[in-house]
Amino acid sequence: PAWLVDCPCVGDDVNRLLTRGER
């Protein structure tokens, strides 16, 4: 999501987790 980009500190980690969860 775009709101994750606002927090690069955990953007990558959260993005990976969400990507795996969504799919």
From Swiss-Prot:
<comment type="similarity">
    <text>Belongs to the MSDIN fungal toxin family.</text>
</comment>
<keyword id="KW-0883">Thioether bond</keyword>
<protein>
    <recommendedName>
        <fullName>Phallacidin proprotein 1</fullName>
    </recommendedName>
</protein>
<dbReference type="InterPro" id="IPR027582">
    <property type="entry name" value="Amanitin/phalloidin"/>
</dbReference>
<feature type="propeptide">
    <location>
        <begin position="9"/>
        <end position="23"/>
    </location>
</feature>
<feature type="propeptide">
    <location>
        <position position="1"/>
    </location>
</feature>
<comment type="function">
    <text>Toxin that belongs to the bicyclic heptapeptides called phallotoxins. Although structurally related to amatoxins, phallotoxins have a different mode of action, which is the stabilization of F-actin. Phallotoxins are poisonous when administered parenterally, but not orally because of poor absorption.</text>
</comment>
<dbReference type="GO" id="GO:0090729">
    <property type="term" value="F:toxin activity"/>
</dbReference>
<keyword id="KW-0800">Toxin</keyword>
<feature type="cross-link" description="2'-cysteinyl-6'-hydroxytryptophan sulfoxide (Trp-Cys)">
    <location>
        <begin position="3"/>
        <end position="7"/>
    </location>
</feature>
<feature type="cross-link" description="Cyclopeptide (Ala-Pro)">
    <location>
        <begin position="2"/>
        <end position="8"/>
    </location>
</feature>
